[in-house]
Amino acid sequence: SVTHVGTTAEQAFAMAAGVCQDHTHVFLALLRDKGIAARYVSGYIYEATQAYMASHAWAEVLLAGNWYTFDISNQHFTPNCHVYIAFGRDYADAAPVRGVRTGGGDERLYSQVMVSTSPQYIPQLNAQFAAQQ
């Protein structure tokens, strides 16, 4: 990728390139420029065909007192497939892993996430989301 966690919305927009984090930062910058409340969300997106997945980022926008999902990268606008980890102003607020390490030696971080649905709750979630519309 041509971007990294430190890439700003302005830089990603100028490059016309990036990943979900960059798409979300650009979208948030445009919304905030217009005075629209919005937040950065980090988590995972559930794909029935994939048992393991990478982290993902999307936005939520506050409209008429309700938060609405805007996954610009995947063009998803309902939260049915999103697994929330954290939300905040930007990646720095909602980084899925953050910390400080001191001392010598090598380090490695390995994580694995498995997500599956529970069919009994999907109709309830869909009804709850529809009621908020």
Where are these regions (language model features)?
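Secondary-structure boundary elements
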Residues: 1-18, 26, 91, 102-130
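Hydrophobic/aromatic-rich core segments of domains that either
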Residues: 22-105
